[in-house]
């Protein structure tokens, strides 16, 4: 897990669910099974929250929810953090340092609905162009090495695997971009923020988190207005 993908995940979940406390954010990310597919260490969530607070991407609010109670640290995304998340998501989609590593794209897709449809498609098109060049590069390398007895056969086999993986992602990208152009997915700027095309089950922990976040928001309103 790179610092980039950790930053996107933590900042993104704050943007979705804030105001929320660190435990809530950790619990939500673990419900996404980020330990498995994103290789995110749960302990790094709190570390990243601190980093995001220091650079102004999130704001920490210490709230006392009941008389005599201990303060609870809750986090909200700042305007700077919102702009930063959009930039990071676009960068993760467009930039292809390693065509064989799809993790930055997988992370970014979770927060693509914050973009406009047009910006998302443009980013996909840039990635498609980069993958087209990557395929050409691998095929050129294959042609150069073919028949060269100084090259171990298993190296050529691995190169074939790399080509297959890159072609597979390129095919998915082309199909996905076409679906989005045709109206697939929902994007926040389209004015349908309450209709994302799915409905979590009644026992989904997210409902409890939503209710708790609303309590924090009401408390923040009273504090800010005091």
Question: Language-model segments: which ranges?
Answer:
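Charged, low-complexity intrinsically disordered regulatory/assembly segments
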Residues: 142-226
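Alpha-helical initiation/capping and key positions within long helical/coiled-coil segments
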Residues: 44, 123-126, 130, 158, ...
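Short, flexible helix-adjacent loops and helix caps
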Residues: 34, 63, 117, 143-150
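Amphipathic alpha-helical dimerization/coiled-coil segments
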Residues: 86-136
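Basic helix-turn-helix/winged-helix DNA-binding cores
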Residues: 1-99
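A structural signal for alpha-helical segments
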Residues: 40, 69-70, 119, 126, ...
């Amino acid at each position: 897990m790179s610092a980039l993908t950790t930053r996107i995940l933590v900042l993104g979940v704050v943007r979705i669910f804030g105001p929320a406390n660190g435990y809530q954010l950790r619990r939500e990310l673990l419900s996404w099974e980020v330990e498995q597919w994103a290789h995110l260490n749960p302990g790094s969530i709190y570390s990243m929250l601190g980093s995001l607070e220091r650079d102004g991407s999130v704001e920490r609010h210490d709230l006392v929810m009941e008389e005599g109670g201990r303060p609870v640290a809750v986090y909200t995304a700042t305007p700077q953090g919102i702009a930063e998340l959009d930039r990071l998501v676009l960068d993760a989609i467009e930039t292809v340092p390693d065509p064989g590593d799809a993790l930055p794209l997988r992370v970014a897709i979770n927060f693509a609905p914050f973009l406009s449809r047009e910006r998302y498609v443009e980013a996909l098109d840039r990635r498609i162009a980069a993958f087209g060049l990557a395929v050409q590069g691998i095929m050129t390398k294959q042609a150069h090495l073919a028949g060269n007895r100084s090259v171990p056969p298993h190296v050529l086999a691995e190169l074939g695997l790399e080509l297959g993986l890159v072609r597979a992602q390129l095919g998915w990208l082309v199909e996905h971009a076409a679906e989005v152009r045709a109206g697939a997915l929902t994007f926040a700027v389209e004015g349908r923020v309450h209709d994302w095309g799915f409905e979590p089950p009644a026992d989904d922990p997210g409902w409890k988190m939503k209710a708790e976040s609303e309590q924090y928001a009401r408390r923040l309103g009273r504090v800010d207005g005091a």
